[in-house]
Amino acid sequence: MAEHRRITRTCTLDELRPELAEAIRAHAQRQHWTHFEADVLACCETTTENIVINVFDAMLNGSAAPLTYLALIATPQRLIWASSTGGETASAASALYTAMRLKIFTPKSSSGIAFDIYAQMDGTGQKAGGRLKLDSGPEARQFCEEVHRATNLLIQPSEKKPRRKWFGR
């Protein structure tokens, strides 16, 4: 099992690593978003360093890259993310909050905060899922709060379902 050291920092789109910012801007252009930068509620970047690498896993899955970079951007309607591993080109994706199942939690198996996402990706008809990980510091928690606020605004009071009563209680 690999051990990781994660560092998350809040930043602006212009303060992201250049390859991540470029991937996000290219994604926004493909989606025909004209003023998405004005809609940014929060932005963060996480650097993950592999401290101990499982050699067998690295041979099978190619997970031996020492550094991985992740950028997350929260807007009022969607979550946008980009990642790059090692010296590879960054890739970006996004999804509307209304088209995703999003769970933000602290995994038992590792320290930090995780975003479990299952969503229909913007620009495709495909649904995909995955886990994005941040550290457990105050800047990561602040970003999670912004996402939580944005998603709560989309839930109408009538959409909140009452808890089920079990066994007639």
Residue ranges and their predicted role:
Residues 1-72:
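Anionic N-terminal interaction surfaces
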Residues 52-114:
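Phosphoinositide-binding peripheral membrane targeting modules
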Residues 91, 118-119, 129, 151:
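Cysteine protease-like catalytic core of ubiquitin/ubiquitin-like
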Residues 113-122:
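Short polybasic amphipathic segments
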Residues 121-145:
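Canonical phosphoinositide-binding patch of PH/PH-like domains
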Residues 138-163:
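Pleckstrin homology
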Residues 164-169:
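Long, low-complexity, intrinsically disordered segments
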